[in-house]
Amino acid sequence: MPREPILIVDDNPVNLKLVRVLLAGAGYDARTASDAEEALEVLREFRPKLILMDIQLPGMDGLELTRRLKANPETRGIVVLALTAYAMKGDDKRTLEAGCDGYISKPVDTRTLPATIEQYLSRDATHGGRET
């Protein structure tokens, strides 16, 4: 049985491929987008349960995209985990204020990423999604 659909949004092609291959190997239906506009295009046809969102994207950044997704009744229930290479003080607060459900620092720990994703998906299923 296939696992949950996931969208990975990152402007670094190496990161996109690494995470997609890792998640596909764990049984997830993983799709990718290299910027916010492409992510919005993918979301017209693909409804992920979770988005791994790079917060530093060209054009519209990942936090603004998250705000838009959480403001839209059709996409607000998608779990969004922020990805950033800059684990600076205050980043976790900024990502949560934008509507992200969690925060993962880059480089991604390939040993724990599938389990981390499973935890967030299980938590979302238990709570029936966010009501905000």
Model-predicted segments: where are they?
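Acidic, metal-coordinating helix/loop segments flanking the phosphotransfer/catalytic sites
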Residues: T32-L50
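Charged docking surfaces used in two-component/phosphorelay signaling
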Residues: K17-G25
